[in-house]
Design a protein with these regions (language model features):
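Glycine-/charge-enriched secondary-structure boundary and capping motifs
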Residues: 35-148
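Short, acidic (Asp/Glu-rich) active-site segment that either coordinates a divalent metal cofactor
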Residues: 1-34
Length: 148
């Protein structure tokens, strides 16, 4: 959502699917997470997925492994990134997380994962029926986050 918002600010383009995603409350997802016994959760906002995941892992004393191919993106996010619509906050997020990160993905993928969000959904530790599984939490390792 962040790169699409940056593109909107620069071009005036409207992205209805991004607006819909931002205005859809996380209530149903939160209810499902609680019902499924989620261990912890956070909403993905200004720190992006990587920043919020790093904070979650650090506070919980664990490390996280992300499967980059399993992470869903809104249509147009990669095109907005390719067009250079990246906020300074996204770059600062990545700079902040990078020392705690082991990644085998390219810089563009890292920027999307660090994308500063207005409303990026919930990151939940637990098994939620119907929710995408993007990784797992493991005992604390050398790095807080590993991306493959």
């Amino acid at each position: 959502i962040g790169v699409l918002n940056s593109r909107h600010k620069a071009t005036g383009e409207i992205f209805p699917h991004a607006i819909e995603a931002m205005t859809t409350l996380n209530a149903a997802a939160a209810t499902a997470a609680v019902a499924a016994g989620a261990r912890c959760a956070t909403d993905i906002t200004g720190f992006g997925l990587l920043g919020h995941l790093m904070k979650l892992a650090r506070a919980s004393g664990v490390s996280a492994v992300l499967d980059a191919a399993a992470i869903p993106y809104l249509d147009g996010a990669r095109q907005a990134l390719a067009g250079g619509y990246v906020s300074g906050g996204t770059r600062r997020n990545l700079d902040w997380v990078r020392p705690h990160l082991a990644a085998s993905v390219d810089e563009d993928e890292l920027l999307l994962l660090a994308d500063a969000q207005t409303s990026g959904g919930l990151l939940v530790a637990g098994e939620i029926p119907g929710a995408p599984v993007i990784g797992e939490l493991l005992p604390r390792g050398e790095k807080l986050i590993t991306i493959s």
